[in-house]
Amino acid sequence: MKVVSLRRIYSSEIYKLPTTRLHMDTLYYYYFVSHLAAALFVDLPITEWLGGSLSCLSGLRRFYLSTYEDPILLIPAPWKTALFSSELFFQVPFFIWVSLRLRKKARDPVLWVAILIYGVHAFTTTWCCMFELFAEKKWMIMSFYFPYLAIPLWMAIDMGGRLVKSCHAAKSGPSSTITSKSD
Protein backbone atom coordinates (compact mmCIF):
# COMPACT_ATOMS: atom_id res chain seq x y z
CA MET A 1 0.00 0.00 0.00
CA LYS A 2 1.48 3.34 -1.08
CA VAL A 3 0.69 6.49 0.92
CA VAL A 4 0.43 9.71 -1.06
CA SER A 5 1.69 12.85 0.63
CA LEU A 6 -1.02 15.19 1.90
CA ARG A 7 1.20 18.10 0.87
CA ARG A 8 0.96 16.87 -2.74
CA ILE A 9 -2.81 16.68 -2.49
CA TYR A 10 -3.17 20.16 -1.00
CA SER A 11 -0.95 21.69 -3.67
CA SER A 12 -2.75 19.93 -6.53
CA GLU A 13 -5.10 21.60 -8.98
CA ILE A 14 -8.21 20.86 -6.90
CA TYR A 15 -7.08 23.40 -4.31
CA LYS A 16 -6.51 26.27 -6.75
CA LEU A 17 -9.11 28.91 -5.96
CA PRO A 18 -11.14 30.63 -8.67
CA THR A 19 -11.09 34.42 -8.81
CA THR A 20 -14.41 34.75 -6.97
CA ARG A 21 -13.02 32.79 -4.04
CA LEU A 22 -9.96 35.02 -3.95
CA HIS A 23 -12.28 38.03 -3.81
CA MET A 24 -14.21 36.40 -0.97
CA ASP A 25 -10.96 35.69 0.87
CA THR A 26 -10.01 39.36 0.46
CA LEU A 27 -13.39 40.36 1.93
CA TYR A 28 -12.81 37.93 4.81
CA TYR A 29 -9.36 39.39 5.41
CA TYR A 30 -10.77 42.92 5.77
CA TYR A 31 -13.62 41.62 7.92
CA PHE A 32 -11.19 39.97 10.36
CA VAL A 33 -8.92 43.02 10.53
CA SER A 34 -11.88 45.35 11.17
CA HIS A 35 -13.37 42.95 13.71
CA LEU A 36 -10.03 42.83 15.54
CA ALA A 37 -10.11 46.63 15.82
CA ALA A 38 -13.76 46.60 16.96
CA ALA A 39 -13.02 43.92 19.56
CA LEU A 40 -10.00 45.74 20.98
CA PHE A 41 -11.32 49.32 20.91
CA VAL A 42 -15.08 48.92 21.46
CA ASP A 43 -16.22 45.49 22.66
CA LEU A 44 -13.58 44.70 25.25
CA PRO A 45 -12.82 47.17 28.06
CA ILE A 46 -9.08 46.64 27.65
CA THR A 47 -8.12 50.17 28.69
CA GLU A 48 -10.13 49.81 31.89
CA TRP A 49 -8.40 46.49 32.58
CA LEU A 50 -5.03 48.17 32.10
CA GLY A 51 -5.93 50.83 34.67
CA GLY A 52 -6.67 53.62 32.22
CA SER A 53 -3.05 53.85 31.05
CA LEU A 54 -4.22 53.99 27.43
CA SER A 55 -7.00 56.54 27.88
CA CYS A 56 -6.66 57.78 24.29
CA LEU A 57 -7.84 54.36 23.08
CA SER A 58 -10.80 54.22 25.46
CA GLY A 59 -12.25 57.38 23.89
CA LEU A 60 -13.77 55.41 21.01
CA ARG A 61 -15.45 52.99 23.43
CA ARG A 62 -16.74 55.85 25.61
CA PHE A 63 -18.07 57.68 22.55
CA TYR A 64 -19.85 54.56 21.27
CA LEU A 65 -21.40 53.76 24.66
CA SER A 66 -22.53 57.33 25.38
CA THR A 67 -23.92 57.85 21.88
CA TYR A 68 -25.71 54.55 21.28
CA GLU A 69 -26.22 53.15 24.81
CA ASP A 70 -25.58 49.60 23.63
CA PRO A 71 -27.24 47.30 26.21
CA ILE A 72 -24.98 44.41 25.21
CA LEU A 73 -21.95 46.36 26.44
CA LEU A 74 -23.56 48.44 29.19
CA ILE A 75 -25.78 46.02 31.10
CA PRO A 76 -23.75 43.23 32.76
CA ALA A 77 -24.96 39.64 32.63
CA PRO A 78 -23.14 36.32 33.13
CA TRP A 79 -23.84 35.16 29.57
CA LYS A 80 -22.32 38.38 28.21
CA THR A 81 -19.21 37.84 30.33
CA ALA A 82 -18.92 34.39 28.75
CA LEU A 83 -19.24 35.86 25.26
CA PHE A 84 -16.67 38.58 25.91
CA SER A 85 -14.21 36.13 27.44
CA SER A 86 -14.54 33.95 24.33
CA GLU A 87 -13.94 37.06 22.24
CA LEU A 88 -10.78 37.86 24.20
CA PHE A 89 -9.30 34.37 24.47
CA PHE A 90 -10.58 32.72 21.27
CA GLN A 91 -11.53 35.34 18.73
CA VAL A 92 -8.79 37.97 19.13
CA PRO A 93 -5.93 35.44 18.70
CA PHE A 94 -7.91 33.81 15.89
CA PHE A 95 -8.36 37.17 14.10
CA ILE A 96 -4.59 37.69 14.11
CA TRP A 97 -3.83 34.14 12.92
CA VAL A 98 -6.49 34.04 10.20
CA SER A 99 -5.64 37.54 8.94
CA LEU A 100 -2.02 36.52 8.46
CA ARG A 101 -3.06 33.32 6.68
CA LEU A 102 -5.54 35.09 4.40
CA ARG A 103 -3.01 37.80 3.60
CA LYS A 104 -0.64 35.07 2.37
CA LYS A 105 -3.54 33.72 0.29
CA ALA A 106 -3.24 30.33 1.94
CA ARG A 107 -5.29 27.58 0.29
CA ASP A 108 -5.32 25.25 3.21
CA PRO A 109 -8.26 23.04 4.24
CA VAL A 110 -7.18 23.53 7.87
CA LEU A 111 -7.82 27.26 7.39
CA TRP A 112 -11.21 26.49 5.84
CA VAL A 113 -12.19 24.33 8.83
CA ALA A 114 -11.06 27.04 11.26
CA ILE A 115 -13.08 29.72 9.44
CA LEU A 116 -16.09 27.38 9.31
CA ILE A 117 -15.90 26.87 13.09
CA TYR A 118 -15.48 30.61 13.65
CA GLY A 119 -18.41 31.38 11.33
CA VAL A 120 -20.78 29.11 13.23
CA HIS A 121 -19.53 30.41 16.60
CA ALA A 122 -19.78 34.09 15.63
CA PHE A 123 -23.18 33.66 14.00
CA THR A 124 -24.72 31.95 17.03
CA THR A 125 -23.28 34.40 19.57
CA THR A 126 -24.31 37.44 17.51
CA TRP A 127 -27.76 35.91 17.01
CA CYS A 128 -28.23 35.90 20.81
CA CYS A 129 -27.16 39.55 21.01
CA MET A 130 -29.55 40.51 18.19
CA PHE A 131 -32.48 39.10 20.14
CA GLU A 132 -31.69 41.31 23.12
CA LEU A 133 -31.30 44.34 20.86
CA PHE A 134 -34.60 43.50 19.16
CA ALA A 135 -36.36 43.29 22.53
CA GLU A 136 -34.92 46.71 23.45
CA LYS A 137 -35.87 48.13 20.02
CA LYS A 138 -32.30 49.24 19.37
CA TRP A 139 -32.57 49.36 15.58
CA MET A 140 -29.46 51.46 14.93
CA ILE A 141 -27.30 49.16 17.03
CA MET A 142 -28.82 46.15 15.27
CA SER A 143 -27.61 47.63 11.99
CA PHE A 144 -24.07 47.75 13.46
CA TYR A 145 -24.30 44.12 14.56
CA PHE A 146 -25.87 42.82 11.34
CA PRO A 147 -22.60 42.47 9.33
CA TYR A 148 -21.18 40.45 12.25
CA LEU A 149 -24.17 38.14 11.86
CA ALA A 150 -24.38 37.90 8.06
CA ILE A 151 -20.70 37.67 7.12
CA PRO A 152 -19.88 34.81 9.55
CA LEU A 153 -22.96 32.94 8.33
CA TRP A 154 -21.76 33.37 4.75
CA MET A 155 -18.24 32.29 5.79
CA ALA A 156 -19.60 29.09 7.32
CA ILE A 157 -21.61 28.30 4.18
CA ASP A 158 -18.70 29.17 1.88
CA MET A 159 -16.10 27.18 3.83
CA GLY A 160 -18.45 24.22 4.16
CA GLY A 161 -18.91 24.31 0.39
CA ARG A 162 -15.16 24.49 -0.21
CA LEU A 163 -14.57 21.52 2.07
CA VAL A 164 -17.30 19.43 0.42
CA LYS A 165 -15.97 20.22 -3.07
CA SER A 166 -12.40 19.41 -2.09
CA CYS A 167 -13.51 16.13 -0.49
CA HIS A 168 -15.42 15.15 -3.64
CA ALA A 169 -12.47 16.12 -5.83
CA ALA A 170 -10.04 14.22 -3.62
CA LYS A 171 -12.32 11.19 -3.66
CA SER A 172 -12.79 11.13 -7.44
CA GLY A 173 -9.37 12.25 -8.66
CA PRO A 174 -6.77 9.52 -9.29
CA SER A 175 -3.86 11.66 -8.09
CA SER A 176 -5.77 12.74 -5.03
CA THR A 177 -6.21 9.38 -3.36
CA ILE A 178 -4.86 9.20 0.16
CA THR A 179 -3.91 5.55 -0.20
CA SER A 180 -3.54 3.42 -3.29
CA LYS A 181 -2.58 -0.19 -3.92
CA SER A 182 0.71 -0.69 -5.67
CA ASP A 183 1.09 -3.59 -8.09
UniProtKB/Swiss-Prot annotation:
The chain crosses the membrane at residues 26-46, 82-102, 111-131, 139-159. Its main location: endoplasmic reticulum. Keywords: Endoplasmic reticulum, Membrane, Transmembrane, Transmembrane helix. Pfam families: EBP. GO terms for cellular component: endoplasmic reticulum; endoplasmic reticulum membrane. It is found in: Endoplasmic reticulum membrane. Residues 24-156 form the EXPERA domain. Residues 1-25, 103-110, 160-183 are cytoplasmic. It is a multi-pass membrane protein. The keyword Aminoacyl-tRNA synthetase does not apply. One of its GO terms (biological process) is protein targeting to mitochondrion. Residues 47-81, 132-138 are lumenal. Part of an import route for newly synthesized mitochondrial proteins termed the ER-SURF pathway (ER surface-mediated protein targeting), which retrieves mitochondrial precursor proteins from the ER surface and reroutes them to mitochondria for efficient mitochondrial import. Acts as a quality control factor in the ER, promoting the proteolytic degradation of nonproductive and extramitochondrial precursor proteins in the ER membrane thus removing them from the ER surface. Belongs to the TMEM97/sigma-2 receptor family. This is Efficient mitochondria targeting-associated protein 19.
